[in-house]
Amino acid sequence: MTTEASNPEVNATAEVAVPVNPLLRSVTVEIPSDVVDAERNKHVQQYAKLARVPGFRKGKVPPSVIRTRFAQDINEEIVRTLIPHYFREETGKQNLQPVSQPQVTDLHLHDGEPLKFTAEFEILPEIPTTGYENIKVEHPPVEVTDAEIEDTIKSLQEQRATYDPIEDRAAEDGDFVQISFEGRDKSDPEAKPVEVPSIMVELGGSNTVQEFTENLRGTKAGDEKTFDVVYPADYGDQRLAGKSVEYHVSVKSLKKKIFPELDEAFISELGADVKTPDELRAKIREGAEHEKKHHAEHEGKDKLVDALVKLNDFPVPESMVNSQIEIRLERGLRALAQQGMRTEDMKKMDFGKLREGQREAATREVKASLLLEKIADAEKIEVSDEELDRQIAGLARQSQQSPEQVRARLTQDGSLDRIRTQIRNEKTLDLLYSRSA
C-alpha cells in the first residue's frame, strides 16, 4: 500500500545526531493528523472485510470493534506504510542520501493526532579523489624459465607414475616400501598402541622420518624391524611432538616408481590438444605466463588500491563497514565448512572477536569501493548490458542454474545493482592500473 503525501504540509528538521559519528544524521517528522486518520480508516475498512470476530458475521464487524480489537495491528500497518514514504520525502527535501536503514525513535502515534517520529541514519561522506591520476605501481616483466616448464612436466609425469615390484634386491634410497607398523609411546606404557595396517614410505624421501629410512634400508619383503623414533618438541604433528615412540615394522613389499616417457602416448593422455613434447612445452609456457601475469596484476592492483586509500582519508559509514564484515565472515565460514569444519565447532567460535578482527580489512574495502565509484563517475565509466549478461552467465555456471534464474534471484534480493557496481569498479581499477606503469 502506498500513500500520496505531496499535498499536506509536513514539519521537519535535520541535525547531526551524534558528534562522534560525523556521518550520522536524524530527521524529525510530523505527519498531519488528517493523513494519519485517512490511513487508519483505510486499514479499518480492509480489516472489516476480512476479520472474523465472534458474534459478528464476516464483513459485518463495526469499525469501532475493529479499531479496538486490532488497534496494535492497524498501528503497525500505519507505521509500515507512512514512515518509509515520509522519511524518503523529508531526506529528499534536505538533500540527504541515507546509506543505512533508518532507526526510528521517539515514535508518537495516537488517534486523532499527528504521527511524529525521529529517524537516525548514516549518509555518504564527501569523497575526495586526490592524485588518483598520478599513482604509479611496478609492472614487473613476466618470465617463465625452462626449468619451471620442466618441473611442470615432471609433476605431470609424477601424477601418472606407476609402481613396479622389486624382487631381486634389497631396499635402497628412492624405493617405496609397503609396510605395516605398530607404534607405542614409551613414556606411557598404558597408552593404546597406534596400529597402521598398510602404508607406503619412500626411503630418503622428504616426507619420510629419517629413522624409517635408516632402518628400512637394506630390507626385503618379510623382514621385521623394531626401532625408536624421538620426535622433537616442535614436530609438526602435536600428537607426536616431544615423544619417544617404539615402532615394530613389518615389510610387505618393495616397489620402484616408474615415470612415463614423454612421448605421444603420454601427451595424448593429458588431453591438452597438443601432440609433441615441444607443443606441450609451449602450452605449459603459455599457461604459466598467463598465471604469472594474473598474479602480478593482482598484486599491482592491490598496491594501487592501498596507495589510493592512503592518499584519500575520509570517514566511512559504520553501517557499510558492518555489512562488509558480515560478508567477509560468511565467506570465511563457508571456506571452513568446505574444509570439513562441523557446524557444532563453528558455533563455539568467538564471533565478536572474529568480527572485530575483520574490521580493518572491511573498512579498507568499503573505502576502496567508494573511491572507485567516485572515480568511475569522473571518468564516465559505464557497464553495458552485455557485460552484465556475461557476469550473470558466469554466476549461473558456478551455481548450475540458468542465467534467467540467476537474474531473477539477483533482482529479487536487490543484488543486481551490487553486481553492476562491482563490474564498474573492476573496470575503473583496470583503467587505473593501465595508467600506473
From Swiss-Prot:
Among InterPro entries, the record links this protein to:
PPIase_dom_sf, PPIase_FKBP_dom, Trig_fac, Trigger_fac_C, Trigger_fac_C_sf, Trigger_fac_ribosome-bd_bac, Trigger_fac_ribosome-bd_sf, Trigger_fact/SurA_dom_sf
Q: Which organism is it from?
A: Koribacter versatilis (strain Ellin345)
Q: Which Pfam families match?
A: FKBP_C, Trigger_C, Trigger_N
Q: Which NCBIfam families match?
A: tig
Cross-referenced PANTHER family? TRIGGER FACTOR CHAPERONE AND PEPTIDYL-PROLYL CIS/TRANS ISOMERASE, TRIGGER FACTOR-LIKE PROTEIN TIG, CHLOROPLASTIC
Instruction: State the name under which the record lists this protein.
Output: Trigger factor
What remark about domains does the record contain?
Consists of 3 domains; the N-terminus binds the ribosome, the middle domain has PPIase activity, while the C-terminus has intrinsic chaperone activity on its own.
| Homology family | Belongs to the FKBP-type PPIase family. Tig subfamily.
Write down any Gene Ontology CC term: cytoplasm
Q: Which UniProt keywords apply?
A: Cell cycle, Cell division, Chaperone, Cytoplasm, Isomerase, Rotamase
- EC number(s)? 5.2.1.8
Q: Where in the cell is it found?
A: Cytoplasm
Q: What does the record give as the reaction this protein catalyses?
A: [protein]-peptidylproline (omega=180) = [protein]-peptidylproline (omega=0)
